[in-house]
């Protein structure tokens, strides 16, 4: 067998098995219907989540297959994060706060994901891997140590409390699942940028059928689809950044060398609700709220950990790559829109006020039309359509895997653990697709408003998820310190921990409550907005307390946390891993380019 360059780390304590009510569950023994072919291809042990491809349905501890390559993982993280918000919705932030507020807000949000260093024996010392901290860095340290399905949800149960995992898991599941019908209807709206020929129900049916085809078969097909869609997103944002640089220097039909003109007139900052310093601060705060909900990435990377090839080598690099690329895209993207369009642009205001379809409300398209550039708006709209489709595809994957993780730990119905012979949790995927049928509400305009309510209702869930990640890491580190584990032997070690995690926790927690601040301003009280902004903040503790009272769970003491559960399986997989041969020259090129 080929060596991976990773030694099996030696830890100070043996495996702990817990049977008390509040303790972490002991992994079940895998049960495969066709036991004669339990071994996986290329030396994959079945215990590592690569069971047999025979038999129609199997049930066990974790029977997903490790078929996602490094290039898939990296583009999943980027593709799940870059959606229509970076191309279209970012214009609303420009109108609210101005170009400087928008740029500062997106930059500050990236400081909650600053880089820190990884170190894993000689191999990782030779390759300095960096990833965002505190949120992404905290997840990177835990996920690379134990790359399992639905990691941050299951880690919450192992390192904090089972009730905490239930609240976090269903919060994340509802958030991801409810965004699927939103993106499906977005695809229909984007198509209306051209013609209103295809009926809404037909577009919705086609998109849902495509999601089913991609997600109900082997995970490698999801990985391939997301790779190419995300690659298109990357090319689009890079192209738009280059476009901005060219036209600002006069490379446009009007030969207008405008540079940073709009930062001077009408200005770099825009007041919101009030004039003066208070108005400028509220404008910046509104941009900060938008950036907080827009920037993601590590959650999508971590959700693929249980299906990643060679995860202790691939995952640290994926976290590093996703951080730097998203940092560049979001910071330069927020800078670009402020260069192209003034914050008081009448066309941009009218586009959002009238709810114009597709890319019509994109600051880039508004700038193209002002500069009399004809073809590019259609290209942008086509790529925005791809972005919406890809985002919905990612939500189907993440929602189904989060539900699968809940089922694995006994927090969702047992039948949801079943996987097809290709390693797909079929009933979890079907459950998400059933929720996606809500997209047919788009057929009725009034019902479409109700659908938007659902989406707004779970918006705060994202920042709750980020807070959960940071707090879970804090408990994880306490357990490691209490049990004498040497963190330097982990596949990934972050800087400034646990202080970075506390910084991320406090920042995300505060932003969770700030999201609906506008309802508390004089004359701005609105009951629906209040409910949309704060309902999930109330639901989370209700679920947590309810499960805790019913199941009588307890917070895990640092000395009682099971830090070795399933680790031996991962280490055995790493020892026996043999890379699959490249299919062709194109496959070889992209695998090396994203390795």
What label would you give each PLM region?
Residues 127, 148, 171-184, 290, ...:
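Membrane-helix boundary/coupling elements in multi-pass transport proteins
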Residues 153-158, 183-204, 302-312, 317-324, ...:
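Helix-loop-helix connectors at the membrane interface of multi-pass transporters/channels
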Residues 1-103, 118, 125-134, 553-595:
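Membrane-interface "cap" regions at the ends of multi-pass membrane proteins
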Residues 418-423, 466-533, 557-563:
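C-terminal membrane-solvent junction of multi-pass transporters and transport-like membrane proteins
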Residues 151-157, 161, 271-275, 287, ...:
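TM-loop-TM module centered on a large, flexible mid-protein loop between adjacent transmembrane helices
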Residues 201-264, 296, 319-327, 455-468, ...:
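Membrane-interface loop-to-helix entry segments
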Residues 88-196, 200:
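Extracellular loop-to-transmembrane helix junctions
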Residues 14, 31, 63-64, 195, ...:
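Helix-loop-helix junctions that connect adjacent transmembrane segments
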């Amino acid at each position: 067998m080929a060596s991976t360059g990773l030694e099996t780390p030696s830890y100070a304590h043996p495996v702990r098995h817990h049977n008390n009510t509040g303790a972490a569950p002991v992994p079940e023994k895998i049960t495969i219907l066709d036991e004669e072919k339990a071994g996986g291809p290329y030396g994959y042990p079945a215990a590592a989540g690569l069971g047999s491809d025979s038999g129609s349905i199997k049930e066990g501890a974790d029977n997903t297959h490790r078929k996602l390559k490094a290039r898939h993982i990296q583009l999943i993280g980027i593709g799940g994060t870059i959606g229509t918000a970076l191309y279209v919705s970012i214009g609303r932030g420009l109108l609210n706060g101005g170009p400087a507020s928008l740029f500062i807000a997106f930059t500050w949000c990236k400081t909650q994901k600053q880089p820190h260093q990884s170190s894993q024996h000689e191999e990782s010392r030779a390759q300095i891997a960096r990833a965002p901290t505190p949120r992404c860095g905290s997840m990177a340290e835990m996920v690379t140590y134990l790359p399992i399905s639905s990691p941050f949800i299951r880690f919450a149960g192992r390192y904090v409390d089972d009730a905490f995992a239930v609240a976090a898991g269903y919060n994340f599941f509802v958030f991801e699942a409810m965004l699927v019908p939103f993106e499906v209807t977005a695809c229909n709206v984007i198509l209306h940028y051209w013609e209103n020929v295809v009926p809404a129900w037909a577009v919705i049916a086609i998109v849902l059928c495509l999601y089913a085809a991609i997600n109900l078969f082997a995970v490698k097909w999801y990985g391939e689809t997301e790779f190419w869609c995300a690659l298109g997103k990357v090319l689009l944002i890079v192209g738009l950044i280059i476009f901005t640089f060219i036209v600002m220097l006069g490379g446009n039909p009007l030969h207008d060398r405008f540079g940073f003109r709009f930062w001077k007139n009408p200005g770099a900052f825009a007041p919101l609700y009030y004039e003066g310093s208070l108005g400028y601060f509220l404008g910046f705060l509104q941009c900060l709220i938008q950036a907080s909900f827009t920037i993601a990435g590590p959650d999508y990377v971590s959700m693929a950990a249980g299906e990643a090839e060679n995860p202790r080598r691939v995952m640290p690099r994926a976290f590093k790559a996703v951080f730097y690329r998203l940092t560049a895209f979001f910071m330069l993207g927020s800078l670009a829109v402020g260069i192209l369009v003034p914050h008081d642009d009448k066309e941009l205001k009218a586009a959002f006020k009238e709810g114009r379809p597709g890319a019509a409300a994109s600051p880039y398209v508004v700038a193209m039309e002002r500069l009399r550039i004809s073809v590019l708006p259609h290209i942008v709209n086509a790529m925005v359509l791809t972005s919406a489709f890809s985002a919905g595809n990612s939500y189907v994957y993440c929602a189904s895997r989060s539900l699968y993780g809940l089922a694995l730990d006994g927090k969702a119905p047992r039948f949801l653990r079943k996987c097809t012979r290709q390693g797909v949790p079929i009933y979890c995927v079907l459950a998400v697709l059933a929720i996606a049928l809500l997209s047919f509400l788009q057929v009725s305009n009034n019902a479409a408003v109700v659908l938007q309510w659902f989406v707004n209702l779970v918006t705060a869930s994202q920042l709750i998820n980020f807070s959960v990640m940071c707090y879970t890491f804090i408990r994880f580190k306490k357990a490691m310190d209490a049990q004498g584990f040497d963190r330097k032997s982990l596949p990934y070690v972050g800087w400034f921990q646990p202080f970075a995690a506390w910084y991320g926790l406090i920042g995300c927690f505060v932003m969770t409550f700030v999201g609906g601040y506008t309802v508390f301003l004089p004359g701005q009280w609105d009951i629906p907005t209040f409910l949309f902004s704060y309902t999930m903040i109330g639901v989370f503790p209700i679920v947590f307390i309810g499960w805790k009272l019913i199941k009588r769970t307890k917070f895990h003491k640092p000395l009682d946390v099971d830090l070795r559960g399933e680790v031996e399986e991962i280490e055995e997989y790493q020892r026996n891993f043999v890379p699959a041969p490249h299919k062709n020259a194109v496959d070889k090129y992209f695998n090396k380019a994203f390795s």
